[in-house]
């Protein structure tokens, strides 16, 4: 039984950009239904840019619906032109299958696949078996080339070149929706706003072939307050795989959220009650930093688990100083409200031998080697500008030696870049 209409949850939390028919969608969601969202297996891990659709699938499942994560193993062989100014590099089947396997493990962290409450399906299972002539006759005849060329996903590519393989993408995505409708009783698709044209094509195809009504809903394309694409940093993508982005780095991404985005991100990327999230509007600077810590903790907990979130919070508190979280601020959060151990094990670290440190390592070299700076020249500039620190003390010369004399009581050396990026040196 559905206790609350998930459409209202989506509206309240800012998930919805466009919808085929608001009244019809809300009515459809009054009873359990199946809804799918597509994911490209173009990398071994999903990244933060995939979190909005993942959170939507979780909300759907929590409200009694069947969430379908459709992995585009078939469509990835072609490449989606939506939102792209250039043709994507075509991956091998082996690489796509490996990525899809990794994605299944990731989805299992967010969704329960027991009793088909959620499904992960690969469209390669049917797309790679299609007969081209039959597909053109049965599916292609329902598509107007004029309408296809008017779609935003194609219009932006026409001047730079759109090849025939990519031109077929809309047909294949529409066919995915039809296939899921026919075989899994899936009546709704959700996705990024750049997919709107493809999603409407699927709704129209179901109407033409089956004479039935299907629904589509899009998410807003998120950027940060600085205009940066969601999930991008100077190091690249922020991954959901802890081997690619550690829980500590993941936590740090969220805690560095811009002030204007805190409330929006709490609504989208946590399950905290909205009446608590609304508190953010009236917070001062100090309290807003507490809200960022809660956002970072809750987001890390959802992706990496409570233990990893606690370790990341604790390491951050050790590195930056304890900031007591007011007990009245978003009390549903399980973030610690002041308890602290001195465990900084979640902070990224490198190991150096005693002999290396005894001889001394130039500061600019070790700042580059540990990954705080992308090059030695960047490290030299950073130190010259006063942005390099060892054990919270400024590094005054780029060739200042980091030695065993810098080891603290725990036998470690703490390096810092700017205000927020740390690295630990451990002796092996």
Curated annotation (Swiss-Prot):
Domain S4 RNA-binding, first and last residues per copy: 361-427
One protein family per Pfam: SYY_C-terminal
Main localization (coarse): cytoplasm
Catalysed conversion reaction: tRNA(Tyr) + L-tyrosine + ATP = L-tyrosyl-tRNA(Tyr) + AMP + diphosphate + H(+)
Localization annotation: Cytoplasm
GO cellular component: cytosol
Gene3D superfamilies for the chain: HUPs (3.40.50.620), RNA-binding S4 domain (3.10.290.10), Tyrosyl-Transfer RNA Synthetase (1.10.240.10)
EC number: 6.1.1.1
Keywords: Aminoacyl-tRNA synthetase, ATP-binding, Cytoplasm, Ligase, Nucleotide-binding, Protein biosynthesis, RNA-binding
Single Gene Ontology BP annotation: tyrosyl-tRNA aminoacylation
Motif residue range(s): 'HIGH' region: 41-50
Lineage: superkingdom: Bacteria
Residues where L-tyrosine binds: 36, 169, 173
Coiled coil regions, renumbered to chain: none
PROSITE patterns: S4
UniProt motif ('KMSKS' region) ranges: 229-233
UniProt binding sites for ATP: 232
Role description: Catalyzes the attachment of tyrosine to tRNA(Tyr) in a two-step reaction: tyrosine is first activated by ATP to form Tyr-AMP and then transferred to the acceptor end of tRNA(Tyr).
Family: Belongs to the class-I aminoacyl-tRNA synthetase family. TyrS type 1 subfamily.
Subunit structure: Homodimer.
Classification via PANTHER family: TYROSINE--TRNA LIGASE, MITOCHONDRIAL (PTHR11766:SF0), TYROSYL-TRNA SYNTHETASE (PTHR11766)
Name this protein carries in UniProt: Tyrosine--tRNA ligase
Record organism: Syntrophus aciditrophicus (strain SB)
């Amino acid at each position: 039984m559905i206790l609350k209409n998930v459409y209202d949850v989506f509206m309240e939390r800012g998930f919805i950009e466009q919808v085929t028919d608001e009244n019809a969608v809300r009515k459809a969601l009054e009873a359990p239904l199946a809804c799918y969202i597509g994911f490209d297996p173009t990398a071994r891990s999903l990244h933060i840019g995939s979190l909005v659709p993942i959170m939507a699938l979780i909300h759907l499942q929590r409200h009694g619906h069947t969430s379908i994560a459709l992995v585009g193993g078939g469509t990835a062989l072609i490449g989606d032109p939506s939102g792209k100014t250039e043709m994507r590099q075509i991956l091998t089947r082996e690489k796509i299958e490996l990525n899809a396997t990794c994605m299944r493990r990731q989805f299992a962290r967010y969704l329960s696949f027991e009793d088909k409450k959620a499904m992960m399906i690969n469209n390669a299972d049917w797309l790679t078996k299609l007969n081209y002539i039959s597909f053109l006759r049965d599916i292609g005849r329902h598509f107007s080339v004029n309408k296809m060329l008017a779609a935003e996903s194609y219009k932006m590519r026409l001047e730079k070149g759109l090849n025939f393989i990519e031109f077929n993408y809309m047909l294949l995505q529409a066919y995915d929706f039809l296939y899921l409708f026919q075989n899994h009783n899936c009546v709704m698709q959700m996705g990024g706003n750049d997919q709107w044209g493809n999603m409407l094509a699927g709704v129209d195809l179901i109407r033409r072939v089956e004479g039935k009504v299907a629904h589509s809903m899009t998410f807003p394309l998120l950027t940060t307050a600085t205009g940066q694409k969601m999930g991008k940093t100077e190091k690249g993508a922020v991954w959901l795989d802890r081997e690619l982005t550690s829980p500590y780095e993941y936590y740090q991404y969220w805690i560095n959220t811009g002030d204007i985005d805190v409330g929006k991100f709490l609504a989208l990327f946590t399950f905290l009650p909205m009446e608590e999230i609304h508190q953010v509007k009236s917070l001062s600077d100090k309290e807003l930093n507490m809200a960022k810590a809660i956002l970072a903790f809750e987001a890390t907990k959802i992706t990496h688990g409570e233990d990893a979130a606690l370790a990341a919070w604790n390491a951050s508190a050790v590195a930056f100083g304890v900031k007591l979280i007011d007990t009245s601020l978003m009390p549903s959060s399980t973030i610690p409200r002041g308890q602290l151990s001195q465990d900084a094990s979640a902070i990224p670290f490198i190991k150096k031998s005693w002999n290396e440190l005894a001889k001394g390592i130039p500061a600019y070299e070790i700042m580059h080697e540990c990954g705080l700076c992308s090059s030695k020249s960047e490290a030299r500039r950073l130190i010259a500008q006063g942005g390099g620190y060892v054990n919270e003390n400024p590094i005054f010369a780029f060739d200042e030696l980091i030695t065993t004399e810098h080891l603290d009581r725990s036998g470690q050396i703490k390096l810092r870049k700017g205000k927020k990026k740390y690295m630990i040196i451990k002796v092996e």
